[in-house]
């Protein structure tokens, strides 16, 4: 058999899941064998992913590759349909890297190690399935499977308020999943044919009411996971109580699932409805940035400050997706990858700091940079990446989003100025709360409660390896963005072009100011959009 025809994606998804099922029969008394087993499986799966994409993925194609489709449960229309394209491929690699490093970061877990590593592998498999599923029911199945391990990881291995945080997480995400199911079934059963194939759903014609309601339903569902204000309140609690490996995956992968689904379903599948909601996304993105930055500055808990920082950074994804430009959409994808790496590194280093100080309250810290200089240096590097220092990946992503929205020809100049200026306020606040974090934790007067006169070990080789594995790609992408953008540029060009195809056209020309001038023209092809926008004026 030709290796290119090998079911690579099925193997990549199945390996962690099958390996997790074998954990109960592995002979191990102290948990040492299980942790090596979990790390080996995660690394092997990540290596298999890299090998498959390196040898057989065509970076110049925007079409789906590694396509597999099997009838799984034909009675309910469920097919095992998986494929990868430029949008999902970089997020798959991010998922593989973050999960592998998170398992390595959990090296000291001694409480129920079999259950812990089993849940980590099941979650890993489900996350991969979300990014490659091409059947709506399969996507929903993977989306739901992923929730259970996250809930258990927080509720069993979390902090003092872990059960409250885990319950809040599952209530938010489970309730949001109902919107996926309802919106998906509305689209699947619309028209003469019933299908759950995502590509086929994107080609169907829908009544305007159904399309708008489905878009709103998907936006709510994926907005919880992204998260979008005001659906974000589960995130600070979850981060505040989750262990360091759990927070790495929460920030590094889970939030990206929401951004990915927003592109795949709302923009690619429902471009006509996106015309109505694009300005809303831009406004919500600005709110995320400003609100997240202001709330981050007010936090005294280290992990909660980073959680609100994540909310702010994901606001740039929304603005990029609303821009209708190639560079804006490309910047949104880059921002997702960049934030995954940066947030994972900061949450891991926060866990390293917590192991030494046994507190997350910044007002009880101070002066630990003197006894932990390596940790201080690594944390500073992560903070610089988070505040989008030039030469770091975050700078490139945010700059592309700013250029995308500023050069967009579908918004009025006044709207673009307001979006850019308010977003810039959030950018200015970011170094304030991050530098304040560094000052409170690593500088200042030494806290007597921490007993810093006693020996506190600095970062260890394992911890240094994990941090370096995250910081090196951050710097590499910052210095040479094409390292990652070449994997999805062709796809983002297609996404932006596909979204723009449904924009009203006057005399064969692309609109110069869609939401201010073009809808007032008498020759519009879309009179209903004209009416809506005029009413909003």
UniProtKB/Swiss-Prot annotation:
Family annotation (InterPro entries): NADH_Q_OxRdtase_chain4 (IPR022997), NADH_Q_OxRdtase_chainM/4 (IPR010227), NADH_UbQ_OxRdtase (IPR003918), ND/Mrp_TM (IPR001750)
Source taxon at top rank: Bacteria
Keyword list, A-Z: Membrane, NAD, NADP, Plastoquinone, Quinone, Thylakoid, Translocase, Transmembrane, Transmembrane helix
Cellular compartment(s): Cellular thylakoid membrane
Bilayer-spanning residue ranges: 6-26, 36-56, 87-107, 115-135, 136-156, 169-189, 209-229, 243-263, 277-297, 314-334, 335-355, 387-407, 417-437
Protein name as it appears in the record: NAD(P)H-quinone oxidoreductase chain 4 3
GO annotations of cellular component type: plasma membrane-derived thylakoid membrane
Known role: NDH-1 shuttles electrons from NAD(P)H, via FMN and iron-sulfur (Fe-S) centers, to quinones in the respiratory chain. The immediate electron acceptor for the enzyme in this species is believed to be plastoquinone. Couples the redox reaction to proton translocation (for every two electrons transferred, four hydrogen ions are translocated across the cytoplasmic membrane), and thus conserves the redox energy in a proton gradient.
Record-stated family: Belongs to the complex I subunit 4 family.
GO molecular function ontology, one term from the record: ubiquinone binding
Reaction(s) the record says it catalyses: a plastoquinone + NADH + (n+1) H(+)(in) = a plastoquinol + NAD(+) + n H(+)(out); a plastoquinone + NADPH + (n+1) H(+)(in) = a plastoquinol + NADP(+) + n H(+)(out)
Pfam family, one: Proton_antipo_M
Bilayer topology term: Multi-pass membrane protein
GO BP of this protein: ATP synthesis coupled electron transport; electron transport coupled proton transport
């Amino acid at each position: 058999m030709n290796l290119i025809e090998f079911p690579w994606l099925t193997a990549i998804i199945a390996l962690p899941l099958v390996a997790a099922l074998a954990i109960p029969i592995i002979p191990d008394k102290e948990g040492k064998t299980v942790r090596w087993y979990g790390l080996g499986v995660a690394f092997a799966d990540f290596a298999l992913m890299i090998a498959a994409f390196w040898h057989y993925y065509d970076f110049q194609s925007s079409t789906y590759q590694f396509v597999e489709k099997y009838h799984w449960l034909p009675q309910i229309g469920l097919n095992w349909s998986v494929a990868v394209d430029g949008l999902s491929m970089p997020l798959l690699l991010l998922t593989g890297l973050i999960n592998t490093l998170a398992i390595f970061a959990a090296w000291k877990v001694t409480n129920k190690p079999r259950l812990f590593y089993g849940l980590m592998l099941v979650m890993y498999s489900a996350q991969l399935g979300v990014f490659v599923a091409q059947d709506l029911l399969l996507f929903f199945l993977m989306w739901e499977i992923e929730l259970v391990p996250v809930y258990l990881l927080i509720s069993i291995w979390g902090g003092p308020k872990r059960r409250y945080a885990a319950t809040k997480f599952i209530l938010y995400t489970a309730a949001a999943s109902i919107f996926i199911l309802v919106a998906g079934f509305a689209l699947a059963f619309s028209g003469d044919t019933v299908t759950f194939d995502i590509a086929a759903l994107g080609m169907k014609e829908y009544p305007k009411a159904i399309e708008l309601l489905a878009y709103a339903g998907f936006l709510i569902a994926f907005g919880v996971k992204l998260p979008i204000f005001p659906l974000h309140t589960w995130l600070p609690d979850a981060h505040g109580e989750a262990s360091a490996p759990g927070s790495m995956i929460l920030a590094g992968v889970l939030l990206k699932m929401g951004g990915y689904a927003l592109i795949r379903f709302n923009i690619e599948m429902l471009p006509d409805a996106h015309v109505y909601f694009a300005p809303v996304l831009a406004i919500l993105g600005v709110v995320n940035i400003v609100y997240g930055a202001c709330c981050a500055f007010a936090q005294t808990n280290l992990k909660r400050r980073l959680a609100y920082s994540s909310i702010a950074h994901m606001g740039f994804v929304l603005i990029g997706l609303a821009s209708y430009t190639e560079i804006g959409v490309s910047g949104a994808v880059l921002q997702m990858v960049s934030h995954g790496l940066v947030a994972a590194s900061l949450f891991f280093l926060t866990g390293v700091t917590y192991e030494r100080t046994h507190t997350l309250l910044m007002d009880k810290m101070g002066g630990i940079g003197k006894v932990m200089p390596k940790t201080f240096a690594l944390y500073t590097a992560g903070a610089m990446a988070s505040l989008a220092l030039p030469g770091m990946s975050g700078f490139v992503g945010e700059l592309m989003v700013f250029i995308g929205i500023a050069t967009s020809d579908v918004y009025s100049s006044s709207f673009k100025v307001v979006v850019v200026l308010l977003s810039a306020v959030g950018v200015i606040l970011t170094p304030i709360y991050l530098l304040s974090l560094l000052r409170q934790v690593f500088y200042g007067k030494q806290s007597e409660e921490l007993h810093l006169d006693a020996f506190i070990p600095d970062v260890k080789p394992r911890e240094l390896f994990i941090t370096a594995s995250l910081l090196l790609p951050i710097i590499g992408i910052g210095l040479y963005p094409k390292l990652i953008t070449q994997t999805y540029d062709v796809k983002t060009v297609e996404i932006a072009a596909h979204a723009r195809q449904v924009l009203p056209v006057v005399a064969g020309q692309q609109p110069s100011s869609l939401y201010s001038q073009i809808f007032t023209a008498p020759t519009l092809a879309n009179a209903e959009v004209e009416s809506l926008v005029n009413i909003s004026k």
